[in-house]
Amino acid sequence: MPAPRYKSGSSKKVYRKAPGNSSIVHYRRKKQSKAVCGACGALLNGVPRGRAVEITKLAKTQKRPERAFGGNLCPKCVKKMMVIKARNF
């Protein structure tokens, strides 16, 4: 019976072979899902995957790209947004 802390959905089972040809179960934390664009849903490059605890340890410049809407919108959507805003200005 696994310990209660391993029954969570955030734990992932990894099967390993131990000496004597017995298989044992290790539990690992699941990775965070990849960041996606808020407008089109495309995967964002330059945004790290990881739990909040791991990401807070990173430097500010490693957390998201250094451009407008970095970490929220993909470059194509940012370009479209800039054109729309410039035309309506």
Swiss-Prot record:
Q: Which GO terms describe its biological process?
A: translation
Alphabetical GO CC annotations of the entry are: ribonucleoprotein complex; ribosome
Please name the Pfam families in this protein's record.
Ribosomal_L34e (PF01199)
Q: Which GO molecular-function terms appear in the entry?
A: structural constituent of ribosome
Q: Where is this region: Disordered?
A: 1-22
Q: Does the keyword Cell inner membrane apply?
A: no
Keywords tagged on the record: Ribonucleoprotein, Ribosomal protein
Q: Which family does it belong to?
A: Belongs to the eukaryotic ribosomal protein eL34 family.
Q: Which NCBIfam families match?
A: PRK04059.1
- Its recorded name reads Large ribosomal subunit protein eL34
- Organism from which the protein derives: Methanococcus maripaludis (strain C7 / ATCC BAA-1331)
Q: Which gene encodes it?
A: rpl34e
